Amino acid sequence: DVVASSTAHKQQDINHLLDK
């Protein structure tokens, strides 16, 4: 699922930003 993949990637980016 392309949409789910895109959402998961965005969530990873958010998690990385919050991790700092």
Swiss-Prot record:
- What keywords are annotated for this sequence in UniProt? Copper, Oxygen transport, Secreted, Transport
A GO molecular-function descriptor: oxygen carrier activity
Biased composition of type Basic and acidic residues is found at: 10-20
**GO CC terms in record:** extracellular region
In this chain, the stretch annotated as Disordered covers: 1-20
Quick one: where is this thing mainly located? secreted
- Taxonomically, the superkingdom here is Eukaryota
| Subcellular location field | Secreted, Extracellular space
Protein family according to the UniProt entry? Belongs to the tyrosinase family. Hemocyanin subfamily.
Name-wise, this protein is Hemocyanin subunit II
